[in-house]
Amino acid sequence: MANPILKLGLPKGSLEDPTIDLFDRAGWKVRKHPRNYFPDINDPEITARLCRVQEIPLYIQDGVLDLGLTGKDWVKETKADVVVVSDLIYSKVSNKPARWVLAVADDSPYQKPEDLAGKRIATELMGVCTEYFKERNIPVNTTIRGARPKPRLWKASPTPSWK
């Protein structure tokens, strides 16, 4: 019986190079290919795939991957049924844990979370953000960061043109 192949999810994007460096320091050589999400790794029992960090927890939960590197924020956001094996403290710019913050301009009238009651909050982590404000009994409307209504290019006529 052949040895099973371990399916590993590596983050693409800003954590891609720091993750490859981390594996390099551990003795695994990961070699990326242009326009290909399946880098080579110098271990015949491992196959790697570059994935969005947001998707890695769900890919593990669904059995597409056996393990992967992602943030606890995305495990919490996706509510994926996975086991966190280890905390790896690294990022694209430091060796400190990443953190999500509520940011406003210094001269903003909003200086504490309660000041945002009834406002729209744009975030990548809608579930985490909603839960944060709900735990504090602050009613807000969360939306995906960058989401905008699609512009209407035409006006629907009340009578279809084919009648």
PLM features: what roles do these ranges have?
Residues M1-K163:
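Domain-level signature for soluble enzymes in the chorismate/prephenate branch of the shikimate pathway
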